[in-house]
Amino acid sequence: MGLLPIWVKNMEKNGIDLKEQKKQLRGEIRKLRKSHTDEEIHQMSLAVLERVQALLEYQEAEVVYAYMDCRHEVETRDLIRLAWKEGKRVAVPRVCGQEMKFYYITSFEDDLEDGSFGIREPKEKNPAYVEDALLLMPGVAFDEKRHRVGYGGGFYDRFLEAHPDLVTIALAFEFQVKEEVPFETFDIRPARVITERRTLT
């Protein structure tokens, strides 16, 4: 029998189940996010943006599925503005019940409204149905094998299961990357994880 991951050993040792492990990790990352200033988050986000911009997958993409950042996630507005400037179409997600759907936006002022979980969401007027788009996704934590811990709603897992041909890149800060994170077999890994310092493939 092979060696068990560290988080499994800790889980068995402490009698903590997978759900509780993820909950504790989310709390840890939330504190780390709050410990950084807005300016620090902005500068680190610009470094992530530069790495995304250099990727062939980004350069060749005609459609980018992005996200509207909140609560000290990797900022996306500068990246979205860049994509618009380069003639790419940009869509962002809207939560519809238990589903997540993407809608095109061409303006932060005209095409967005207050939505679920305090996140700005697109108005339901221009749905996106491109199956080979580049999808930039957030997350709470990742490990060096690209396993992802999300926010617990399962929206991205369900969306990616239904749209397997999307090119997926997760954006994160280095403090969100751990040696190992708890994961389940149905969790879908992004093709790459990009931080301000490196790209995990």
What are these regions (language model features)?
Residues 6, 12-128:
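N-terminal active-site beta-alpha-beta segment that forms phosphate/nucleotide-binding
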Residues 98-201:
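Conserved phosphate- and dinucleotide-binding cores of soluble alpha/beta proteins
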